[in-house]
Amino acid sequence: MEAKAIARHLRVTPMKARRVVDLVRGKQATEALAILKFAQQGASEPVYKLVTSAVANARVKADREGQAFDEDALYITEAFVDEGPTMKRFQPRAQGRAYRINKRTSHVTVVVASKDEKGGN
């Protein structure tokens, strides 16, 4: 069984989010949650919530299909970060100048699947 969770327009730069996502890609879901809980990066909190949501989506999907659900059998099969829209802001500077500040956003996707399906991909 496969389940997906997507977080869009996260106010974290894609480069910083990718550092966090690379820590948990391919890991067991419960192990990934433990890693993210103690990670120092600011992007680890939204990714933690996203992995939790993906596990919950898998639980709902298993209940709906009448399958047995085992949280320990779930692995993160896919995890990637795409660049979202950039908010452009201006910082006033001396003598009438203005510097542009790019506030970048990210779209993060996490896919979890059972161990038996992980080997089939």
Curated annotation (Swiss-Prot):
Q: Which cysteines are joined by disulfide bonds?
A: none
GO BP, sorted A to Z: translation
Q: In its keyword annotation, does this UniProt entry include Ribonucleoprotein?
A: yes
This protein's GO CC annotations: cytosolic large ribosomal subunit
Q: Where are the transmembrane segments?
A: none
Q: What are the entry keywords?
A: Ribonucleoprotein, Ribosomal protein, RNA-binding, rRNA-binding
InterPro entries linked = Ribosomal_uL22, Ribosomal_uL22_bac/chlpt-type, Ribosomal_uL22_bac/org-type, Ribosomal_uL22_CS, Ribosomal_uL22_sf
Any one Gene Ontology MF annotation carried by this entry is: rRNA binding
What the protein does comes down to:
This protein binds specifically to 23S rRNA; its binding is stimulated by other ribosomal proteins, e.g. L4, L17, and L20. It is important during the early stages of 50S assembly. It makes multiple contacts with different domains of the 23S rRNA in the assembled 50S subunit and ribosome.
What do we know about how this protein assembles, alone or with others?
A: Part of the 50S ribosomal subunit.
Would you identify the family this protein belongs to, as annotated? Belongs to the universal ribosomal protein uL22 family.
Q: What is this protein called?
A: Large ribosomal subunit protein uL22
Native organism: Micrococcus luteus (strain ATCC 4698 / DSM 20030 / JCM 1464 / CCM 169 / CCUG 5858 / IAM 1056 / NBRC 3333 / NCIMB 9278 / NCTC 2665 / VKM Ac-2230) (Micrococcus lysodeikticus)
